[in-house]
């Protein structure tokens, strides 16, 4: 069950906020505090803004910033770590009151993060491998995410079969998920990896679909591939569409992460997407922003805020209506708790 978090105690009435993620510079949403206090400027430094998971995460950040009467600026690096480092430097030099970092790396951002700390700017990380005293990390339990999805794969396929892994290196959560995957293969010697690929691009789902189509042509017979394990929902979307178009829906997809778009795909007739392990991305965004406001107020914040995932199975969902993230808790008991 996911850890419950209290709301930030100081709630300020806010004006409407519009936040648009953009490349290069930042897009700003204003929410002036009704109390007359100067609105706190918050920078969200993103490695990439791809798919509906990212959109719902940003919306969660925006909601919390709006509630606290702040101004949010989103900097999107379009997967370019050097650009991400430049965006962080810009946020520090522009004297933002708080900085949120999403999926950065120590190699690219350690120096910039330390610069922010030296200037007394609160920084809160999400799924980023930087370790600096006083800089908290909000993270999903990536090992548990991988374990839940992989164990479901094993359970539904009697602990055996040929699988395709879709994964990419260079992201802190991916590296943790890989550790669990390696242990999984040792635990289930009758499950064999026959192919592995994956890359994070500006069109990840479409690029994955193209690559998965090639894999299906290489293994054309029913039974050649038992399942696909996708370490990110953008990978799962591409794999699912390729499998559907090829008419190979005997191949099941097990994945990590969830969004409204993913739910629609899971609920399609004869969808191969069988299960996914996830944390609500809107909740991640809210907690990420909530934590930086706690830091701004001088409140005590733990070094690590870990969010526990939930397994969502296709079989949990009704056949006669389309479920959204907003009403998923009606069908998956632990969702949103």
Pin down the residues of each PLM region.
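A residue-level marker of the well-folded mature domains of exported/periplasmic proteins
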Residues: 2-4, 22-337
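Sec-dependent N-terminal signal peptides
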Residues: 5-14
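Hydrophobic alpha-helical membrane context
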Residues: 14-16, 59
